[in-house]
C-alpha cells in the first residue's frame, strides 16, 4: 500500500477530493492501493519523547493501520529544507495537512511560512523521531538520487535537474542515508551542476536537520557505504 497525506498549501493535493482526483489522473489508483492517511479526521497525535522544539506530532489517523513502513524518498534540493530526503519524508511526509503547518511553524501553524528557520528544521527532526518511535524500528529507507534538481517535486514549476544521476541508497538508518546522500553530492566535484545544488542546501542550512536528528539519537552520521554495481 502506498501511503500519502494531504498538503498544507494550496494546490492539487491540499484536500482529499482534489488529491484523489490527481491520483486518478496519474492512474496511480489503477496500479497501487493508495491510502491517504489524513483523508478523514481526527488526526492521530504522537507524543515526542525526546525533542528540541515540538513535543507532539499530528499525523494521519490511518497510520494506525500499519506496523512497518518502507520510506521511499526522491533526494533533491528543497526551497525551505535545503534538501529533501528520508528525514523530511518521515516528518512532513507522514504529517497530516494540519501537522505539516504545525511543523513548519515550529508549533504555531499560523507561522507556516514566517517562523524561525532553524527551529523549523529542528521541528522536522522532532517529528521524524516520533514516527520512528511509533514503528519501533520496523522501518527501512530508500533515497533515490535521480533527477537532482534544486527544487522539490512539490513545486508547481520545478527547476530542471542540475546534476547527473548518482544512484539509489538503502539503509535502516534515516540519518545515515541522508548524510551519505549529502556526502555524495559534495564528492561530485566534476559535475557542473554541483555548485548550484550545494548553494541551495547551504543557503537553507539543510544539514541542520541531520545535525538535530543525530543529536536526538535518531541515527548516526557515521556509516559504511557499500557499492553494488
Name the predicted role of every residue range:
Residues 1-229:
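Extended, low-polarity segments enriched in aliphatic/aromatic residues
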Amino acid at each position: 500500500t502506498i501511503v500519502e497525506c494531504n498538503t498544507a498549501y494550496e494546490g492539487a493535493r491540499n484536500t482529499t477530493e482534489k488529491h484523489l482526483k490527481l491520483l486518478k489522473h496519474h492512474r496511480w489508483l489503477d496500479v497501487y492501493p493508495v491510502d491517504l492517511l489524513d483523508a478523514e479526521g481526527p488526526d492521530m497525535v504522537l507524543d515526542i519523547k525526546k525533542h528540541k522544539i515540538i513535543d507532539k506530532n499530528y499525523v494521519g489517523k490511518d497510520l494506525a493501520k500499519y506496523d512497518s513502513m518502507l520510506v521511499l524518498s526522491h533526494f533533491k534540493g528543497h526551497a525551505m529544507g535545503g534538501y529533501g530526503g528520508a528525514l523530511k519524508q518521515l516528518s512532513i511526509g507522514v504529517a497530516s495537512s494540519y501537522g505539516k503547518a504545525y511543523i513548519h511553524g515550529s508549533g504555531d501553524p499560523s507561522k507556516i511560512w514566517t517562523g524561525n528557520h532553524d527551529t523549523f528544521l529542528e521541528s522536522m527532526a522532532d517529528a521524524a523521531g516520533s514516527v520512528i518511535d511509533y514503528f519501533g524500528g520496523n522501518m527501512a529507507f530508500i533515497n533515490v538520487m535521480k533527477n537532482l534538481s534544486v527544487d522539490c517535486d512539490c513545486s508547481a514549476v520545478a527547476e530542471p535537474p542540475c546534476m547527473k544521476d548518482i544512484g539509489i541508497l538503502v539503509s535502516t538508518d534515516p540519518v545515515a542515508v541522508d548524510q551519505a546522500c549529502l556526502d555524495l553530492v559534495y564528492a561530485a566535484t566534476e559535475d557542473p551542476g554541483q555548485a548550484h545544488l550545494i548553494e541551495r542546501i547551504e543557503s537553507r542550512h539543510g544539514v541542520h536537520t541531520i545535525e538535530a536528528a543525530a543529536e536526538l539519537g535518531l541515527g548516526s552520521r557515521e556509516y559504511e557505504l557499500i557499492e553494488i554495481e
